[in-house]
Amino acid sequence: MALAVPQTAVPRLPRGVRLRRDEARGGWVLLAPERILQPDPVAVEILTRVDGRASLAEIVDSLVAAFSAERARIDADVRSFLDNLAEKGFVEFDR
């Protein structure tokens, strides 16, 4: 179920959730109480921009500039990814 998140919403990692580099696992991990995810490189590009200050629109714009990709496509992918993480409690939105 997709969330109706406005472009001005600011995604953030909730208390107790953090993204960190894990050399033992050979990549990045998203840690939460009693849960762990190993994000792929595309997910890491998104998650490193989720800093609790940048809006959804700013994150999308940053990715468009970094990858010279179509904004509509990146917007849809970022929304889908963050909606999925929000449903699982790994991301929250300040509106």
Residue spans for each PLM region:
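Acidic, low-complexity/disordered tracts enriched in E/D and polar residues
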Residues: 1-44, 48, 94-95
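Long, charge-rich, low-complexity alpha-helical segments
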Residues: 35-95
